[in-house]
């Protein structure tokens, strides 16, 4: 049994082994419905989620597990139940894994210290979203074979993005160079010390990127003065058709979703030939099956 609380702490060989295992879970692969037959996986989501919760649900069912879907709406949390009490009550139903999303950074780490089953972080505050980073890396490996020597440009609200943090750790561990790009107000200090290159000039960074990952701009950031306007953001950092033409041959466009069309990505780019966004979604089920398999072994 092993927790997946973040990418930090996982060695390159461990990440590659998990990603290699995910290939067996792609459509057309061997039958895996026996791996967790008779077991229960609990989805414990304190934040709304469509893609991640559905993907983990499908992953668990594909391994033969029963799935307990818990959401905060109408739960005892609204009556004052603590996080640990909720987690312990869920654990008492006998799951082999708790897949957990929470608004507070570090919440899955706290739960992992107090339960005996595997805890899988499905996103905690602005800290990490490890399964998203793994499916992103898997998507690129399927295209390239290896990430060694590749350059991945991550554009947008890095400051508040758990996806960016997990991807930085994962991509660097797998041999890629990571460039972070965005307005100064949305790039946290210390990125260079984690191995990232930092730029505020998207047009200068685009031509050398093998993949461009656009992050969702949370529209409330404009009200909090992180952005002058979404129109200004799109002008400086949005990936439109003109900018797409400056990308190198074979470079791909990624987005963790949901997309603000016309802000981070022009519709023609999001739906264009370079886009692997739907591949990311479909690969997510295979990667999350591998995560459940590895963490519950």
Curated annotation (Swiss-Prot):
| Superkingdom, natural source | Bacteria
* UniProt GO MF annotations: amino acid binding; aspartate carbamoyltransferase activity
Q: How does it assemble?
A: Heterododecamer (2C3:3R2) of six catalytic PyrB chains organized as two trimers (C3), and six regulatory PyrI chains organized as three dimers (R2).
Q: Sorted alphabetically, which keywords does the UniProt record give? A: Pyrimidine biosynthesis, Transferase
Q: Do the record's keywords include Transferase?
A: yes
Q: Which NCBIfam families match?
A: asp_carb_tr, PRK00856.1
Q: In which pathway does it act?
A: Pyrimidine metabolism; UMP biosynthesis via de novo pathway; (S)-dihydroorotate from bicarbonate: step 2/3
Record's function text: Catalyzes the condensation of carbamoyl phosphate and aspartate to form carbamoyl aspartate and inorganic phosphate, the committed step in the de novo pyrimidine nucleotide biosynthesis pathway.
* GO process terms (BP): 'de novo' pyrimidine nucleobase biosynthetic process; 'de novo' UMP biosynthetic process; amino acid metabolic process
Spell out the family assignment given in the record's similarity comment.
Answer: Belongs to the aspartate/ornithine carbamoyltransferase superfamily. ATCase family.
Residues reported to bind carbamoyl phosphate: 51-52, 101, 129, 132, 257-258
Question: Would you tell me the protein name for this molecule?
Answer: Aspartate carbamoyltransferase catalytic subunit
Gene Ontology cellular component?
Answer: cytosol
Q: Which organism is it from?
A: Myxococcus xanthus (strain DK1622)
Q: Which PANTHER family match?
A: ASPARTATE CARBAMOYLTRANSFERASE, ORNITHINE CARBAMOYLTRANSFERASE, MITOCHONDRIAL
Pfam families the record matches: OTCace, OTCace_N
What catalytic activity is recorded? carbamoyl phosphate + L-aspartate = N-carbamoyl-L-aspartate + phosphate + H(+)
List the PROSITE patterns: CARBAMOYLTRANSFERASE (PS00097)
> Which residues are listed for L-aspartate binding in this entry?
79, 162, 216
Q: What is its EC number?
A: 2.1.3.2
